[in-house]
Regions:
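Cell-envelope/extracellular polymer assembly enzymes that use nucleotide-activated donors
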Residues: 16-19, 49, 201
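Short, acidic, metal-binding catalytic loop of nucleotide-sugar glycosyltransferases
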Residues: 36-47
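A conserved acidic beta->alpha catalytic loop
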Residues: 54-63, 108-109
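Glycine-rich, basic loop-to-helix element that forms the pyrophosphate-binding segment
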Residues: 80-96, 117, 171, 175
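Short aromatic/hydrophobic "clamp" motif used to bind/position activated sugar donors
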Residues: 101
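Conserved donor NDP-sugar-binding/catalytic core segment of glycosyltransferases
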Residues: 112-145, 220, 224
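Catalytic donor/gating beta->alpha subdomain of glycosyltransferases that bind UDP-sugars
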Residues: 138, 191-254
Length: 363
């Protein structure tokens, strides 16, 4: 990380309170380590409260949070009956006492200087929002988990425009950001109709109001990916599906890269139809019916094995040559999600704008 010292003028004033908002549901595996990383945050330039917004967990998540909250007054538990992420974020923002809001994830641990550094960088770059670099980690030592982590961290898996592969600088969206609370309320906080991509939508609305978003390499967080191919497939399908819904709600929040897997799968299907049609075509034209599918397959194999070679060289691990299978799973499930949403004319869900907090745990 960049270690250039800060000047006094880059420090926020008056030791402000930062409210960290953490949306969770059934996160008993991760929640304790996440909270410990937050309780160990550097508070030399700010105070910190941690709002855990639980979406009616059916596992031990709530009990773990209550136990930690009973020992540490900085932790508060809120209940999100609607369960969806944007409701959780808005509940946290609504209940926050801080001048600043930090929106965090439950599968992630944070460097000790994460919040303090993002707060400094927010002021240094006169930004509307700031986050650190997101480092992708496997959630277990299983080789499948390693393959998934490598794929999600590689530009061929998630594109060079993804917040997981971008370099430091101003960006169109950022992971786990800190904002002035007034900046969030200015744009109406998160859109509760968007169960996914609510961060892209918020980022676009902030930029439209003139707020810049900055990604700093002075600090980092570690995101632990789901460890199985089944969970990756489900994640990819839902993401692709919601990209179409998000596009309908706010076209400016989505870019071409969000639809490339859909174009890939559509092209694959068309090429497959052409390939099968070659059976009934005149013999001298059959090659032309088969060539598009063969060309697409060859191009994808070259690209995916090129990415695999890059990963294997970096990690010094030959199992990386299995990543083409993971790339293919990610891209096809994502693309099928896009095409499914188009085929059924997927629409935004209805929503209840009300905020309801059933229980708050304070010690």
């Amino acid at each position: 990380m960049n270690s250039t010292p800060y000047s006094i003028r880059q420090e926020p004033h008056d030791h402000p309170l930062v409210s960290a908002v953490l949306a969770v549901r059934n996160e008993e595996r991760y929640i304790e380590s996440v909270l410990q990383s937050l309780l160990l945050q550097d508070t030399s330039i700010c105070d910190l409260e941690i709002l855990v917004v639980d979406g009616d967990s059916s596992d031990a998540t709530r009990q773990i949070v209550e136990r930690i909250a009973n020992r540490n007054a900085r932790v508060r538990l809120l209940i999100n009956h609607r369960r969806k992420t944007p409701y959780a974020f808005n509940l946290g923002i609504h209940a926050a006492k801080g001048e600043y809001i930090c929106i965090l994830g439950a599968h992630t641990t944070y460097a000790k200087d994460y919040i303090a550094t993002c707060l400094r960088e927010l002021h240094l770059h006169n930004a509307g929002g700031c986050s650190g670099v997101e480092i992708i980690r496997p959630s277990s030592d299983d080789f499948q988990a390693r393959l998934i982590a490598w794929v999600l961290a590689h530009p061929f898996g998630t594109s060079t425009g993804s917040m997981r592969t971008r370099k430091a600088g101003f960006s169109d969206t950022i992971p786990y950001p800190i904002f002035l609370k007034s900046t969030l309320t200015e744009v109406g906080a998160y859109d509760i109709q968007l169960h996914r991509n609510q961060d892209n939508d918020l980022s676009q609305r902030l930029r439209a109001r003139g707020h810049k978003l900055y990604l700093t390499d002075r600090t980092y967080c570690e995101y632990f990916v789901s460890p199985t191919l089944a969970s990756l497939s489900k994640y990819a399908f839902k993401t692709g599906f919601w990209n179409i819904i998000s596009f309908k709600k706010n076209r400016a929040s989505m870019s071409l890269r969000h639809f490339v897997p859909g174009v890939f799968v559509a092209g694959l299907l068309l090429c497959l139809v052409a390939f099968v049609s070659a059976i009934s075509a005149p013999e001298h034209t059959r090659l032309w019916f088969r060539l598009p599918l063969l060309s697409l397959i060859i191009a994808y194999v070259i690209a995916s094995f090129g990415a695999a070679f890059n990963i294997a060289s970096r990690e010094r691990d030959a199992t990386a040559f299995l990543t083409p299978l993971i790339f293919l799973t990610l891209h096809t499930c994502y693309g099928v999600g896009v095409l499914t949403a188009v085929a059924i004319n997927a629409r935004l869900p209805s929503c209840d704008p009300g905020l309801l907090v059933e229980k708050t745990v304070d010690s």
